[in-house]
Amino acid sequence: MFAGDSKVLVVTVRDGAGAVVNITGATLTWEAARSTEETTVISKESGDGISITNPTGGVFEVTLDEADTDDLQGLYYHEAELTQAGDTFTVLTGSLVIERTLIRAA
């Protein structure tokens, strides 16, 4: 993705066997940082940037706004955690590449 762009990350939660997990009533947190030892540069949570769009299908969306990525460039680590019935699970990890763009917002 490019700095200053908005993006929606669509995630389907699956168990170890690949079956879809019902996430009804769950809360979610998503964060991005340079590494697991660095300060978080983007943070989203249920109701504030994260929406569960299909609870029985295990689907949630993380919405990144222009301002979230405007001043970022490079490789970032990101992960999402789901809390349900008192248990917390990491349901997504990965890399996020943010490139500079020639056209900048005024």
Where are the predicted features?
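Contiguous segments within soluble domain cores/interaction surfaces
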Residues: 1-106
